[in-house]
C-alpha cells in the first residue's frame, strides 16, 4: 500500500496551529502575499526557495527542511504516478 505524500502545506498548517498565528498574519510578518500561503496550505502551490527562507527565519527551522519536504512530496507523487513504468 502506497503512503500518501506529505505536502509542505500540511506541515505549515501544523506550525501555524502550534504557534497560534493565522496564515494572513504570518504572510504579513514574512512579507509575502497571503494568497501564497493559502495556496501552499491548500496544496495548490509548491514551496519555493524564497518562501522556504522566509518560513525558516520565522519558525527557526532550516530552509532545507522546507525544501526537502517539497522534494520528497514531488518524488512520492512521481513514484505513485509512474509506478513500474520506469525501470
Which residues fall in each region the model found?
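The alpha-helix within a helix-turn-helix
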Residues: 16, 27, 56
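The DNA-recognition helices of helix-turn-helix-type DNA-binding domains
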Residues: 33, 44, 59, 70-73
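Short, basic-rich loop-to-helix N-cap that marks the start of a DNA-contacting helix
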Residues: 44-57
